[in-house]
């Protein structure tokens, strides 16, 4: 009896991918914060997916599973798949073997609220026409530049509200908002807060 075994049956491969965080530049230790699960299925008809017990190595934001069998014991190719366990506070998008984790509330909206006080002997004022408020924001990302936000506040008596403002920039850095008032003839302006 003869058995012919292909010479490549013991070949090994590696599986790699990347990890991207969109959360305002927070520092992460991928090796301890992320759980990647590696599975494989033989291309032999009727094969069932099985979990591979393996720990990836990390080089920055690139992971690699090393020394993986390329073929099963009968010479059928293995197909490998990597999934990431959910991380609290993040939404994960998988693109092939690459993962992008974005803070879950990146699309959260906020309001900026303040009040206008007139010290002028009780004169009547229409804040919606007499006052021009300018809203600016700066990302907390180092090197960011202040930008004007084109939005008009709503007024309820002496209280103004800038509504539905973006809390984070596209990279997950918090925005800091600031309100200024254009000068009004005959008045000096003092900002509190």
Which stretches of residues belong to each language-model region?
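Solvent-exposed loop/turn and edge beta-strand elements of beta-rich ligand-binding domains
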Residues: 1-193
């Amino acid at each position: 009896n003869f058995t012919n075994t292909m010479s490549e049956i013991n070949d090994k491969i590696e599986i790699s991918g990347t990890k991207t965080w969109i959360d305002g530049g927070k520092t992460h230790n991928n090796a301890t914060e992320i759980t990647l699960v590696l599975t494989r299925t033989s291309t032999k008809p009727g094969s069932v997916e099985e979990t591979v017990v393996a720990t990836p190595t990390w080089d920055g934001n690139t992971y690699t599973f090393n020394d993986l069998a390329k073929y099963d014991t009968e010479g059928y190719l293995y197909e490998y798949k990597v999934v990431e366990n959910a991380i609290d506070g993040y939404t994960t998008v998988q693109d092939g073997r690459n993962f992008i984790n974005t803070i879950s509330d990146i699309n959260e909206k906020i309001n900026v609220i303040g009040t206008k006080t007139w010290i002028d002997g009780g004169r009547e004022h229409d804040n919606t026409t007499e006052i021009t408020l300018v809203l600016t924001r700066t990302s907390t990302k180092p090197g960011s530049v202040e930008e004007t936000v084109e939005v008009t506040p709503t007024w309820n008596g002496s209280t103004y509200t800038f509504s539905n403002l973006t809390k984070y920039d596209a990279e997950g850095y918090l925005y800091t908002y600031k309100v200024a008032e254009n000068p009004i003839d005959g008045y000096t302006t003092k900002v509190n807060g």
